[in-house]
Amino acid sequence: MLDENEKLVSLPVSHRDHRTDGYLEKAASIVGLERLHFDTGAQLLEINSIFQLLAIVDNTPDELVRAKYLQLMPDLIMHALTGEIGTEYTIATTTGLYDTQENQWAYGLAKDLGIPMHFFGEVEDAGSIRGVLSEDIQAKTGLGPLRCIATTSHDTASAVVATPLESPGSAYISSGTWSLMGVEIDSPITNEITLHERLTNEGGFDRSIRLLRNITGLWIIQEVRRDLKSQGIEINYVDLVAAAKAQSDPWRTLFFVDAPVFVYAGGMIARIQQYARETGQPVPETPGEIAQATFASLALQYAHTADVLAECSGLAMPAIHIVGGGAQNEHLSQMTADVSNKEVITGPIEATAIGNAIVQAITTGAIADIGSARALISSSDMKFGTYQPTTDSSAREQIKAVRNRYEELIAHQRVTD
């Protein structure tokens, strides 16, 4: 937040900070879970801006008095470059305070929660020209008055722009620290399924909607590797994947990757092991066992989410596209194809950066539209991979049993769990 002099009221705080602990439940006690979702279309996650602001209301309310402008992180960076205030559409829709049906801030919801809205500004489309580089930045960099474009500033929105969704209804996974899995639709969808399955309606380029789920992704394996290093075990990602792939029983231990216990840093291996004990499963001990439990659980959550997205959207979903850094994990990609029984197409790896550039190119007229951009990507020499689901009858029977087991494991874990 910025004050009347456009200076920071306080330093930004990590979305994983514990200050929002319990604020989803608090908000639900005031207005109900249903309204939190149905008024905005948003997934109910304690990291969302709505709960960050509630924490500020309770703990540092003086900041709200001094605040004149709310700048989400991409907009704050743009302000540093141009000196201009603004709010871009795709990032606004992630806050939990934007009504994607009415295309405006959810003023009534904010009022009933006690969140002031005087610092929320007008929302502009992705691809809008925010301004030019400030004179100070020009002097420091030697650049001229370059135009600064408010691109699809939520990183997943940019990644989806660069995803070559050639088959209508195909799903995407933007795979990195988070795995954001969804489909492109024309208008928001909210119902009991989207509420309880933690789906969100986030903005895309040209005011499209991305119906998706934020799935805890390779953050878990990053934390596993960090834990191993603290124990004196140095292992790179390639070797960790190889150790996982070498396991004789790939489905030995499963866990719900979106359980709150896996959100925060530190002690990840111990938490995975405790989850296994509490659910009566074999406790993974070796790096390979721990990594394989993670990859298997991710693949199963992807397959579960694919089914939910297809049910809610009515789309056939012939394929799943995986983009981002996680697309390099061939083992996870093949497991995803197998358990979902769908073709998996991987690449491009740098989808977020490419999508960002595409929006700028469309704005400046260098590329006609998003369809032309995706066709250009498909015909490029970027690295793509294709994975077909196994057709072996015994393997398919085993996968069916594993999927049933996973569904039983996560059946009670909805919304606030």
Located regions from the model:
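A conserved helix-loop-beta module that forms one wall/lid of the active-site cleft
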Residues: 107, 113-126, 357
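Short alpha-helix plus adjacent loop in nuclease-associated cores
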Residues: 13-30, 358
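Pocket-flanking alpha-helical
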Residues: 1, 22-26, 159-161
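Short beta-strand-loop/turn "lid" adjacent to the catalytic site in phosphate-handling enzymes
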Residues: 1-15, 43-47, 78-99, 122-125
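Short, glycine/charge-rich flexible loops or terminal/linker lids adjacent to PRPP-binding catalytic cores
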Residues: 17, 131-134
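Active-site core segments that coordinate phosphate-bearing ligands/cofactors
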Residues: 28-46, 50-84, 97-107, 111-112, ...
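Short beta-strand to alpha-helix junction loop
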Residues: 101-102, 126-130
